[in-house]
């Protein structure tokens, strides 16, 4: 999506404190107390990026900010939504896949600190977002990432989340 929109991008995992990285690398799932400071860091970064692009033309795709992270619970997404309304609206994209496909993707990551054995703990924590209650696009991870990103952007434009100039 970042390539299509030519916008700011942050991989949320890059903001994990070392204690979280060490805990996950050892195969121990994070708990809420581990996640709160990390989620606030992501939200703060998102807010700062939104301030940087605020003065761009409202029809510019460059005005978007893309952040990837595992906001598994609604309360986690609520923290990320705390970007001031005048700076923009936080939209979530929930990438949905089978256990097998998710495991395959995790096993294919090179140099990531979270071992594949932790997938089940992530799925156990997951509260799937409701498109009717949260500004969320639910997308399949079956297509190749570049294909799925294009589908997501098209859906976001169709729903009015992004300007038509993003296509």
Tell me the role of every PLM-derived stretch.
Residues 12, 68-69, 93-95, 139-141:
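Small/polar loops that bind or transfer phosphate-bearing groups
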Residues 60-67, 77, 102-103, 107, ...:
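Non-catalytic structural scaffold of enzyme domains
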Residues 33-87, 95:
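Glycine-rich phosphate-binding loop used to anchor ATP phosphates in small-molecule kinases
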Residues 23, 28, 83-129:
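A glycine- and Lys/Arg-enriched "phosphate-lid" helix/loop adjacent to the NTP-binding pocket
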Residues 4, 88, 104-107, 127-167:
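NTP-dependent small-molecule kinase module
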Residues 15-16, 71-73, 97-101, 144:
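Conserved nucleotide-binding/hydrolysis micro-motifs of P-loop NTPases
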Residues 2-47:
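Conserved substrate/cofactor phosphate-moiety recognition/catalytic segment
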Residues 1-4, 79-84, 155:
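Alpha-helical structural signal in soluble globular domains
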């Amino acid at each position: 999506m970042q390539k299509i929109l030519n916008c700011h991008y942050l991989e949320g995992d890059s903001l994990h404190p070392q204690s979280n990285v060490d805990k996950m690398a050892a195969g121990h799932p994070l708990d809420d107390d581990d996640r709160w400071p990390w989620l606030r860091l992501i939200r703060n970064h998102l807010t700062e990026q939104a301030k940087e692009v605020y003065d761009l033309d409202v029809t510019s795709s460059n005005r978007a900010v893309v952040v990837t992270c595992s906001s598994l619970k609604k309360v986690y997404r609520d923290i990320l939504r705390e970007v001031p309304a005048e700076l923009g609206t936080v939209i979530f994209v929930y990438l949905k896949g089978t256990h097998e496909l998710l495991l395959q993707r995790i096993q294919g990551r090179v140099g990531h600190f979270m071992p594949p054995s932790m997938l089940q703990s992530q799925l156990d924590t997951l509260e799937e977002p409701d498109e009717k209650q949260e500004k969320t696009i639910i997308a399949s991870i079956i297509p190749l990432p570049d294909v799925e990103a294009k589908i997501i952007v098209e859906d976001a434009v169709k729903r009015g989340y992004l300007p038509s100039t993003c296509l």
